[in-house]
């Protein structure tokens, strides 16, 4: 059904504020991009919603620029994946997974049909469905014409999409050259000049083959991109996660060059997801293992981008990957939380998009397993940035920790758990750029399970990011407060003169005198006025598909 493949969320725009970055020396010239050119979830269902709790809920979107859905056939991507990615400013594309070698008759026919299609129609199709590009596993060989025509078609589509979708990006694997022949040069040179394209004729971003690990290759590629007046950050150093390639001397080379990172692996499942049973095979154990794998891979072995380990040439992605430097070594955590609050409120229930039950505003509605990545909330920007100084990198050896839990939720099937002991520590939650007005309502909701501590909500403004605004006015929890592990505590604050007219730059929590504290975070929101009640939807058709003791499956359009 088309409705499951039409994204209803337009890509949100990311913003840059170096004052709320972990690494202040990263800017638009060296802040690496990342393409995850990998499958999503299981190949049978991809990102389509279903009733399976143990499904993939990727959540580190702030470190991803583009998700190339490897098991989504060319031109067909589940809307749920596009919706959550677009909320976070991430592009999503499908993949033409052409086999290695001479171009088959089937793919010749496919490409000829594509090449005869009017560029405007192709652009309209992609825009209608919400797709942000097309990707090609270009490791074929043919006699130029098909490859040339395919390239020219994408140049035309790029020009049409430039004003309609600013994150639109086509991907090309760097084996098939401009002339349709195979090359293992692993770099941008005259073999890929037209495929990459100059500033006026952009065709594809180039995913370099896996042997890019030399100064000569990287320097040549960067210099060549600059002569074409293209940003070299649209060159992706390919990483074969399945094969562990490049096998030696890899990551340290990237420190010196503005080349981005491209992840591949494997054909049917991504490597984070495929072997998530390394710590056990229960559904929740596998979900926790997957979460730890991705958190360590993207934010370092500490799961805190403020104190990542030293850069190595390792290619690991397992649960105990504690010595891994993490993608946050190379790139900032991106945020889209900057829109006009009069048009849309900011609301996060810390919901991952799956669960063993479904809660609505603290009430259990059912105990059925469910999955819909498309309803995932905005999640903490940097992921567990703890520090003893605000926006700092002073991380204690032992202190507070945080994780997602599927044991409770205010809305959905998950929430955030913060726990541990420390006298003074900050947890940075959201990088924002909201223009606040008098009367805006800030709500924070939590559940205090055990332990004690003083917890305050920290808000800072653009231009004075390290200075909390009247922190004592935003108390959430005091150390002598009674424990209540059954009820969600709501704290609301109305924006007054201290915040009105300022751009909110940071939302954080300040923990003082924490002693074995254990609390759940269930909501963080900023709402202006009252939301307009949407029009009642018109049901054009309904169909009962199946029913059993667990519930009913139906279809409404």
Predicted segments — roles?
Residues 1-8, 235-396:
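Substrate-binding cleft of secreted/luminal carbohydrate-active enzymes
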Residues 26-51, 55-217:
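Chitinase-like catalytic core of GlcNAc-active glycosidases
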Residues 137-312:
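Substrate-binding surface in catalytic domains of secreted glycosidases
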Residues 381, 416, 426-455, 491-493, ...:
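Extra-cytoplasmic beta-strand recognition segments
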Residues 465-502, 514:
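Extracellular carbohydrate recognition and processing domains
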Residues 530-557:
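Pro/Thr/Ser/Gly-rich low-complexity, intrinsically disordered linker/stalk tracts
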